[in-house]
Amino acid sequence: MNNYGVSSIGTSLTPSPTGSIDEYTSKEVKHPEDVKVDASYEKEEVGYGELEVVPERGNLFQRWYRSFLPPEDGKPQKLKRTLTARHIQMIGIGGAIGTGVWVGSKNTLREGGAASVLICYSLVGSMVLMTVYSLGELAVAFPINGSFHTYGTRFIHPSWGFTLGWNYLASFLATYPLELITASICLQFWININSGIWITVFIALLCFVNMFGVRGYGEVEFFVSSLKVMAMVGFIICGIVIDCGGVRTDHRGYIGATIFRKNAFIHGFHGFCSVFSTAAFSYAGTEYIGIAASETKNPAKAFPKAVKQVFIRVSLFYILALFVVSLLISGRDERLTTLSATAASPFILALMDAKIRGLPHVLNAVILISVLTAANGITYTGSRTLHSMAEQGHAPKWFKYVDREGRPLLAMAFVLCFGALGYICESAQSDTVFDWLLSISNLATLFVWLSINVSYIIYRLAFKKQGKSYDEVGYHSPFGIYGACYGAFIIILVFITEFYVSIFPIGASPDAGAFFQSYLCFPVVVIVFIAHALITRQKFRKLSEIDLDTGFSKYDRLEESDKGPMTAKSLAKSVLSFCV
């Protein structure tokens, strides 16, 4: 017998936990001479004539190093399904509550006024809700890698999936360094240090977090999103107390709706259109749960609960928080224009005006964490988008590589490298550079939402055309095709209002450069789509030819009926789960 427990007569000896020689047992092996033995592995029989190579535990560094290697069996590794329902819910919340509401609200208040903000955010919120319901049904029916751009390839046109995927990825690559710069600006609220130093620290931190795979991303999002929700609820309560004159340090006393009435509409219809388009971009990130579908345990159970709860909460948080802040801060407040990005946040200004010690610092810390988690979300969604595009042949094939822990390493590294663009902030021309970088992708979220709704409509029509049973789908959007049509209609209105505001910007004369910085993405997407379609010569598929079988997750409703009738206890539990 050799040193590794494999004898020359066709047996493998497995030591007992005690290590006693008398307790060694012999197991028959079919072809031991074909077994390649390595000193770093122990051998374990899993069936007649089969050997499974199991890595020794080793020390922490050895296990960490081996996790980056390809799978031992040589087969391509797939993304791991380790996310749960609680992760999916918080990813949806975390993707939506970010700089769009904390910092971006200063622009909407200044350009449109309080009433415009409430109306536009409510209207856009209803559109996002319909879109996410459609995405939820698609994700349950087809929990495949790539989500909406994969749906675009299958249900709309392969060239559209190619165009949408690259445009969406470009938006991540352009926004990622901006999030790092914004985070460094948040720190200037306390200490003025070169931004390049902080950007280096943030990139290292994001690399560390993403080394823990999708489960690490899910846990970080769960913790941070919970913190953001508590901060949002805390501000709403605190803001109501300030408005009612309940803060001793605030000598303004009762404020009521005085500020709101004086600044309900600013710049009239022009301002309303500006807020309408800005509100749409503030909700960006709500579609992140679609990307996570391929890494979620039991999507049929996780997604219905997520789409029913998360986005109603997000809409309420947005609307209530913006209503409260509009009661306290005027859209004509000069500080919204003169102060730096985070210092000019109306949420921080509201607390500073009330002279509440400490709270502005707490809220600035929450904004800092929100910005960093936004960058973390970009790393996750950007890498998964690039990986799925490589699987479809829309990106270089080496981005398909997934290590033993289910991490798309090369795709992650590619996205993280773009954080180095954040060092451009030290240049005098940094604003111009980033404006043009964003110009080719700033409408990407609108294209994604439109694609989700159109894909859903075509999917439902194809399902009916091919005579398939709709009961096999695990989750049904409560608004169906009508909700998707409504969502698509509102998105088209946002495109129109953005076009109008780009031509006639508020407080400035029409300018060709400013227009293309705002709307260049639209012609770029159209040109890329047409060019790719002409080169590949692929045509639109008929409803009867659309593939509804690959990746389809059939749902058995008999399992649901076995749960028994609804009782008072189960009803109360469902209501409590929805509200909490």
Curated annotation (Swiss-Prot):
Residues 1-30 are annotated as: Disordered. Residues 1-19 have a biased composition (Polar residues). GO terms for cellular component: membrane. PROSITE patterns: AMINO_ACID_PERMEASE_1. Keywords: Amino-acid transport, Membrane, Transmembrane, Transmembrane helix, Transport. It is found in: Membrane. It holds the Pfam family AA_permease. GO terms for molecular function: amino acid transmembrane transporter activity. GO terms for biological process: amino acid transmembrane transport. The keyword Membrane applies. It is a multi-pass membrane protein. The chain crosses the membrane at residues 112-132, 189-209, 222-242, 310-330, 408-428, 432-452, 488-508, 515-535. Belongs to the amino acid-polyamine-organocation (APC) superfamily. This is Sexual differentiation process putative amino-acid permease isp5. It comes from Schizosaccharomyces pombe (strain 972 / ATCC 24843) (Fission yeast). The lineage of its organism: Eukaryota, Fungi, Dikarya, Ascomycota, Taphrinomycotina.
